[in-house]
Amino acid sequence: MSLYENKKVVAIGGGHGLGRMLAALKVFGSNATGIVTTTDNGGSTGRIRHCQGGIAWGDTRNCINQLITEPSISSMMFEYRFKGAGELNGHNLGNLMLTALDNLSVRPLDAINLIRNMLKVDVNILPMSEHPSDLAALAMDGKWVTGETSVDEMTQDLRRLDLAPEVPATKEAVTAIQDADCVILGPGSFLTSVMPPLLLPELGKAIARNQTAKVIFVENLSPEYGPAGRMSLEQKLEWCERACQGRKIDVVLGHHPHPELEQRWNFVTRDLASANRDWRHDRQKLRQAIEEQLMN
C-alpha cells in the first residue's frame, strides 16, 4: 500500500496558501482534507455576505480552483469573474454558484460536495464551520475590531483574537483531525487564514487529543503586512499551541533557519520556493517536504 493510500493528511487555513498546499497534496486524493477559513468579509465574498448572509465562500472557491485538473466549461464558469460597470462587477461566478447551491441545500457542505463532484475534485474540502461568523480582535487600547479586512488594517498590535459570534465546528472537520496522521497549519495569512479555524474549541481540542499525528507549521515565504507582519515567528507558534490546548507543534517547515528557536521547536529547512515566483511555494517541493515528514 502506497503512502498516498496509507496516510491521512489534514491542512488548515485559507486563501491562496491553503489552496497551494492542497494542490501539493492532491496525490493523496480523498485521504487529503482541507479545513477552510470561512470568516472573510472583503471583495466579492464580503458583498455576498452583506446581501445574503451565510459563511464566506471565497477561500473555499480558491481551494477548489487550485484542485481542478480537467479544464471544462464547468471549471471555466466556476473561475469566471465579472468585469465592467454595475453590481456584478468584481463578483466571482464561483462564489455566486456556491451561494446558490447553499440556498438550495440542507447545509453548506452539501453545496461544496456538489461542486467537487461536478469539477472532479477528489480532495475533501470542509468549511471550518457551517455557521456565519466574523473575526474579532482586541487591540492594545482595549477596543474591539471586527471583520477580517479591519483586522488586517489595524495599526495597533493584538491582545487576542476571537470569533463573533462563537459558532460550532463542522463535525466532519473534527473527525478528519481525529483520524489524521498529519495536521498542517499554513502557509497563509496568519491572523486571517491560519488562526480562525483554531479559534473553534472543538478543532483545537481535536488536534490536542490526536497525539499520534504529526503537527506541522509551514512558514510563509514573504513577509506579511499589518499586525501579523509585526508578530515574530515565536509568537505565531505560541498562539497556535495555545489554541490547541498546549499541543506542541512537532515540526516547523520553512525556507530559512531559525537557530535562536531551535531549543524549543524542531525546524526543518528546505528550499520551498517556486523557481519563477520566489514568494510562492512550489507544489512539488511542498509535497516532497510533507512526504518526508510522513515517512519519518
Curated annotation (Swiss-Prot):
Q: Which GO terms describe its cellular component?
A: cytoplasm
Keyword Amino-acid biosynthesis applies? no
The subcellular location is: Cytoplasm
* The keyword Cytoplasm is assigned to this record: yes
Which ranges form a coiled coil? none
| GO MF entries | LPPG:FO 2-phospho-L-lactate transferase activity
Concerning InterPro entries, the annotation shows: CofD, CofD-like_dom_sf, Gluconeogen_factor
Q: Which domain of life is it from?
A: Bacteria
CDD domains, sorted: YvcK_like (cd07187)
Keyword tags:
Cytoplasm
Q: What is the predominant subcellular site recorded for this chain? A: cytoplasm
Q: Could you give a single Gene Ontology term from the biological process aspect?
A: regulation of cell shape
Q: Write out the function statement from the record.
A: Required for morphogenesis under gluconeogenic growth conditions.
Family according to the record: Belongs to the gluconeogenesis factor family.
Which PANTHER family is this protein grouped with?
Answer: GLUCONEOGENESIS FACTOR-RELATED, UNCHARACTERIZED PROTEIN YVCK-RELATED
Do you know which HAMAP family this protein is assigned to?
Gluconeogen_factor
Instruction: Please state what the protein is called.
Output: Putative gluconeogenesis factor
Q: What is the organism field in this record?
A: Vibrio cholerae serotype O1 (strain ATCC 39315 / El Tor Inaba N16961)
